């Protein structure tokens, strides 16, 4: 994906919207080409079973999106304020996708936290 753009649900390439700006623990970091547009990660990816990372304006981890075999999101690992889970405190949490719909955030399991905590270093 990266500099080539994202795929639409129909499998066609969309206009170039993203660029790769580096890697974090082996996962490509994406950045919007037009910073004025919505900053969320792409809804589809070119390579099945891919993950991408989004950083905040200060270069700190904001989100990791894991895509499945069908190139649609499986889950998002977020690090930020989430009112239902932690009020105004930044907390790591997960949003699963069920039938393409992003679910409310949930606390991470211990094994999920252990797998993804490397992305939160210096942020907690």
Predicted regions and their residues:
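Catalytic toxin/effector domains delivered as secreted proteins or via bacterial secretion systems
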Residues: 2-124
